[in-house]
Each structure stands twice: as structure tokens, then as C-alpha cells.
């Protein structure tokens, strides 16, 4: 499908805007994937707040020029789907988890903090809990001593009330 120059410029601007605030950009090959699988992948990405797009590699290379993802341009070969997210692990997690279900999605590379990652490093990044999960775990750890102290005080109050009644 041939795109005219204005359509290409609009696409590059849209992609540049989408990745401007992204911490992570992950690319995966999608050769031979069914429409229903791609629709499911897009739905998963939307749910996790991941910008997911299939586009020409030349347009993607232009969009990443001058960004922290510029080093990833060498990896942009073949039919690729691009996933970008503000959450450092969301894009990697969405593509990695979907690749486990559908072998037609193959994670090729990614970029985080200006560093290019291979597929194994993207898988490692995907295994890290999200920011929300880490915050909830931290909150639980911080609440545990306080709630234990409160339960101890309540038990002591019950014991004192039981002794006074007897």
C-alpha cells in the first residue's frame, strides 16, 4: 500500500508524539499472525496503556530519529509491530506475554533509557513487576508493623477488660 507524502508526515508526527513520553519501545515480528490474534493483542495493549502500531519501518526510523530510541533503528527489519509505553515494563510485558500464547509474535528487540535490548533482555524487563504492583507491595510492607501493633493493642485492651470484669 502506497502512502502519499502528507499521509507519511502525519504518521511520523503521530508516532513521534506517542513515543515522546515513552520510557520503553519494544519491537516484535508478527509474520503470519491471524486477524483475531492481532485484535486480541491490540486490546491487551490498550488495556495496559501501551501504544501499539504496525507501520512501515522507514517511517518508524524517521519517528525515532533524535530520540532515546534512535539506536533501535538498526533492529527495524521485517514485518514489525511497535509497542511504546510510559510505564517502563508495560510494553515489554504485553508483547512478551502475548508471545507466550502465540508463537507467531516474536519479540526482536527493545530500548529502555537509550539502551538497546535484545529479546532476552526484553523478557527480563517483562518479568519485573509494574510500578503499581511494586507500590502496593511497598504499602503492604509499610502497613504490616502498624497493623500488628494495632492488633496487639486491641488484644491488650480485651485482656484488661476481661480482667476487670472478673
Curated annotation (Swiss-Prot):
Q: Which PROSITE patterns would you find in this protein's record? A: RIBOSOMAL_L10 (PS01109)
Secretion signal: which residues? none
Transmembrane stretches in the record are none
- Mind telling me which InterPro entries this protein's record contains? Ribosomal_uL10, Ribosomal_uL10-like_sf, Ribosomal_uL10_bac, Ribosomal_uL10_bac_type, Ribosomal_uL10_CS_bac
| One GO process term, biological-process aspect | translation
One Gene Ontology term of the molecular function aspect: structural constituent of ribosome
Record's keyword terms, sorted: Ribonucleoprotein, Ribosomal protein, RNA-binding, rRNA-binding
Q: Its GO CC terms?
A: cytosolic large ribosomal subunit
Q: Does the keyword Ribonucleoprotein apply?
A: yes
Give the protein's biological function. Forms part of the ribosomal stalk, playing a central role in the interaction of the ribosome with GTP-bound translation factors.
Q: How does it associate, per the subunit comment?
A: Part of the ribosomal stalk of the 50S ribosomal subunit. The N-terminus interacts with L11 and the large rRNA to form the base of the stalk. The C-terminus forms an elongated spine to which L12 dimers bind in a sequential fashion forming a multimeric L10(L12)X complex.
What does the similarity note say? Belongs to the universal ribosomal protein uL10 family.
Q: What is the recorded name of this protein?
A: Large ribosomal subunit protein uL10
* UniProt organism field: Neisseria meningitidis serogroup B (strain ATCC BAA-335 / MC58)
Amino acid at each position: 500500500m502506497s502512502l502519499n507524502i502528507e499521509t507519511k508526515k502525519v504518521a511520523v508526527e503521530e508516532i513521534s508524539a506517542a513515543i515522546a513520553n515513552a520510557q520503553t519501545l519494544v519491537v516484535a515480528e508478527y509474520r503470519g499472525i491471524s486477524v483475531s490474534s492481532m485484535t486480541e493483542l491490540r486490546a491487551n495493549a490498550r488495556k495496559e496503556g501501551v501504544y501499539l502500531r504496525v507501520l512501515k519501518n522507514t517511517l518508524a526510523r524517521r519517528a525515532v530519529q533524535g530520540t532515546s530510541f534512535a539506536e533501535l533503528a538498526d533492529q527495524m527489519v521485517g514485518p514489525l509491530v511497535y509497542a511504546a509505553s510510559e510505564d517502563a515494563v508495560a510494553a515489554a510485558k504485553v508483547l512478551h506475554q502475548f508471545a507466550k500464547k502465540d508463537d507467531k509474535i516474536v519479540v526482536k528487540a527493545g530500548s529502555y533509557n537509550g539502551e538497546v535490548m535484545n529479546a532476552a533482555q526484553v523478557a527480563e524487563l517483562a518479568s519485573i513487576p509494574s510500578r503499581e504492583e511494586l507500590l502496593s507491595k511497598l504499602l503492604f510492607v509499610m502497613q504490616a508493623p502498624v497493623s500488628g501493633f494495632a492488633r496487639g493493642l486491641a488484644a491488650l485492651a480485651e485482656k484488661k477488660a476481661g480482667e476487670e470484669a472478673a
